[in-house]
């Protein structure tokens, strides 16, 4: 704990704010508006993430949203890592909170999967590979994107802990809990058998 706080509270707070400022950029909304598609919040789930952008029929735009939402998790963490591990973790938390609760949109943001991935890429690429393997395996077998993301996110802190990254594991325990909370509607649909499957239209 002492090591994590070594940079001092002003630096930790600055890293948190930096992360939040990056995470709060609503790329899904910005890209769809620039593409002349209107407000993405008015279609599908009303979410600003890549999955809902895909419902516009623009795969390239959805891919760009996914990439940008991931990078806004990766870049502030990498920048803050120059100050130490504590600031890097603070920036990761800030980026994730910014994506979920952007001040510009009345604190109504995305569900966090892409930004979760982006933060994980910066802090533990090896664990990201495990995340991807779990997601792809379940997505291929069960055809549920949400279930795959939920399972992979739940496994992430356990994998990090097993690898000896206690502080990072603690951060991702918090991020995974928030991700599950934001996916509450998906969890209810999964339980009811009404969740949409990958590749299914309508």
Swiss-Prot record:
One of its Pfam families is G3P_acyltransf
Keyword presence, Cell inner membrane: yes
**What does the record give as EC number?**
2.3.1.275
Subcellular location field: Cell inner membrane
Q: What class of enzyme is it?
A: transferase
Signal peptide limits = none
Describe its membrane topology.
Answer: Multi-pass membrane protein
Which stretches are transmembrane? 11-31, 87-107, 116-136, 158-178
Which one of the record's GO molecular function terms can you name? acyl-phosphate glycerol-3-phosphate acyltransferase activity
Which InterPro entries does this entry report, sorted A to Z?
G3P_acylTferase_PlsY
User: Which reaction(s) are listed as its catalytic activity?
Assistant: an acyl phosphate + sn-glycerol 3-phosphate = a 1-acyl-sn-glycero-3-phosphate + phosphate
**Biological role stated in the UniProt entry:** Catalyzes the transfer of an acyl group from acyl-phosphate (acyl-PO(4)) to glycerol-3-phosphate (G3P) to form lysophosphatidic acid (LPA). This enzyme utilizes acyl-phosphate as fatty acyl donor, but not acyl-CoA or acyl-ACP.
Looking up HAMAP family in the UniProt record yields: PlsY
Q: What is this protein called?
A: Glycerol-3-phosphate acyltransferase
| Source organism | Methylorubrum extorquens (strain PA1)
Gene that specifies this protein: plsY
């Amino acid at each position: 704990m002492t090591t994590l706080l070594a940079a001092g509270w002003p630096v930790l707070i600055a890293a948190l704010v930096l992360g939040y400022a990056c995470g709060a950029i609503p790329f899904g909304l910005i890209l769809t508006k620039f593409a002349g598609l209107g407000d993405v919040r008015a279609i599908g789930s009303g979410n600003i993430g890549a999955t809902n952008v895909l419902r516009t029929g623009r795969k390239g735009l959805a891919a760009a949203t996914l990439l940008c939402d991931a990078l806004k998790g990766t870049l502030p963490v990498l920048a803050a890592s120059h100050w130490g591990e504590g600031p890097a973790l603070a920036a990761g938390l800030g980026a994730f909170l910014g994506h979920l609760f952007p001040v510009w949109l009345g604190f109504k943001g995305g569900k966090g999967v892409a930004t979760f991935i982006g933060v994980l890429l910066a802090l533990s690429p090896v664990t990201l590979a495990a995340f991807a393997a779990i997601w792809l395996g379940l997505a291929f077998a069960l055809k549920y994107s949400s279930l795959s993301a939920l399972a992979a996110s739940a496994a992430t802190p356990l994998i990090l802990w097993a690898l000896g990254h206690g502080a990072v594991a603690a951060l991702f325990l918090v991020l995974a809990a928030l991700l599950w909370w934001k996916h509450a509607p998906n969890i209810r649909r999964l339980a009811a058998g009404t969740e949409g499957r990958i590749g299914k239209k309508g």
